[in-house]
Structures are given as C-alpha cells and as structure tokens.
Regions:
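The identity of the second residue at the extreme N-terminus of proteins
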Residues: 2, 26, 36-37
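C-terminal capping/extension of enzyme domains
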Residues: 201-234
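A structural signal for short, hydrophobic/glycine-enriched beta-strand patches
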Residues: 30-213
Length: 234
C-alpha cells in the first residue's frame, strides 16, 4: 500500500478544493457553494495568519538568525542592529542535514562571494558587510535543522551568561511560525518579536497562486503538526 506523505495530501486537497470551489461559484449562484467558498476563504486566512507570524519589533537583548543560504534575513538583522534594536546577533547553522554540506549562497552571490563552509560563516560575512561589528556576532555553527538552531543557540547564550528577556527572530516569512515555536520552546520566558523576510519569492500575498507556494506553506503546516505531536508524545 502506497502511503501519501501528509504534506502532499494536504496540498492535493487544498489545490483541488480551491479549484473546485472557485470554478463552481463562478458557474452558479448556489447559496451552499457560496457559503462553502466563504468558509474556505476564512480557513485560508486563518492559515496565513498562523504560518506568517509577524510582530513589530521592540528593543531586545539579541537578534536570532536561523541558518539558511539567503542573505536577506541577516541583512534585516544588521539593519535592526544598526537602529539600536539589540546588543547582540546570533546567526545559527552548520548546514542542512539533508544536503550534508553548505549548498552555497542562494541570492546575491556576487556580493557575498567567499567560500563558506557553514551557514554561520556565510551569515557572519553578511552581517559584517552590512556594518555589524564582528565582536557583536555570537557563534553557533553546529545546527543542521531548525530545532537544533534553537537548542544550540540556547547553549551559546547560556554559556555567555546572557539573560534573554526579549529577542528578535529574523527568518523566512513562511518559516516564521515554526521558528518561533522552536525558539519559544527553548526560551520559555523570553518575549519574541518575529521579523520575517521574503527571500525566495513566496509571500503571504502570493503563496496560493502557484504550486511552489502551496508546497511551502502546506509543508510547514505538516511539519508543525508532525514534529510537535511527536515531541509532546515524548
């Protein structure tokens, strides 16, 4: 028996239902279909609000930047740092556990053109080139997935004896909720401000318009349900 992965099932239902409801409502004035479409739109809106977490940042103790190959999150962190929004920045990441190595700079490789062995090396270079003093950049270069970003970042701040009462989290827009959940788990007493960045073309406004966006968002929903359910069972 072939088992369809959860995120593929969600994506399939989402795509088919979306196409069916939109097509049906265009062809008929049936009140039930109109009502179904309204319910579906509310569901999509709730999903967007959940996945695309965002806050207005306030003065914090630190800015966290989970590992990735895009420079935009670290650029945003540098911008916030230079505005006096935090005293420290902690980029985190070795490389993806899936790839087994740093897979390279995904955008602006003409600007960030060094040979990087880890995500942390790359993000550090982005921060420095955007005006952040090297001594204000903490180091975490062992994490290979999001939960480890949070775990090892906590170890770094504990070792540095930093009291983190408030923190800013700079991450990819559709990755925001899962990042927040993991970091909040490791910093239960910390107030977080999520500052998401659109790095790969998938945004809150356009994710429903193409398969790549639907894949990204439904994949996040699936991972949150699966990963946190397993964690709670333990």
């Amino acid at each position: 028996m072939h088992i369809v992965p959860a995120h593929q099932s969600v994506k399939f239902c989402w795509t088919v239902t979306n196409a069916f409801l939109r097509g049906a409502v265009e062809k008929t004035d049936n009140e039930e279909l109109v009502m179904m479409n309204d319910v579906y739109e509310k569901f999509l809106k709730s999903s967007e609000e959940f996945i695309f977490a965002e806050n207005k940042p306030e003065k914090s103790d630190i800015i966290f930047v989970p590992g990735n190959g895009y420079p935009q999150m670290a650029e945003k962190a540098a911008e916030l740092f230079k505005k006096g929004m935090a005293d420290w920045i902690l980029p985190s990441g070795k490389y993806s556990v899936v790839n087994g190595k740093f897979s390279g700079v995904l955008e602006k490789s003409n600007v960030y053109d060094k040979e990087y062995g880890t995500e942390w090396e790359f993000l550090r270079d982005v921060l420095i080139k955007n005006g952040v003093p090297d001594q204000k950049i903490l180091k975490e270069d062992q994490a290979t997935f999001t939960y480890e970003n949070a775990i090892y970042s906590r170890q770094v701040t504990d070792h540095a004896e930093l009291e983190i009462e408030r923190a800013i989290l700079c991450c990819k827009s559709y990755h925001a909720r899962r990042c927040l959940m993991y970091y909040q788990l490791l910093y239960p007493k910390t107030e977080f401000y999520v500052v998401p960045v659109n790095a790969d073309g998938i945004t809150r406004e356009n994710w429903r318009k193409n398969e790549e966006g639907i894949d990204a968002v439904t994949g996040e929903l699936s991972r949150i349900v699966k990963q946190f359910s397993l964690m709670l069972e333990r």
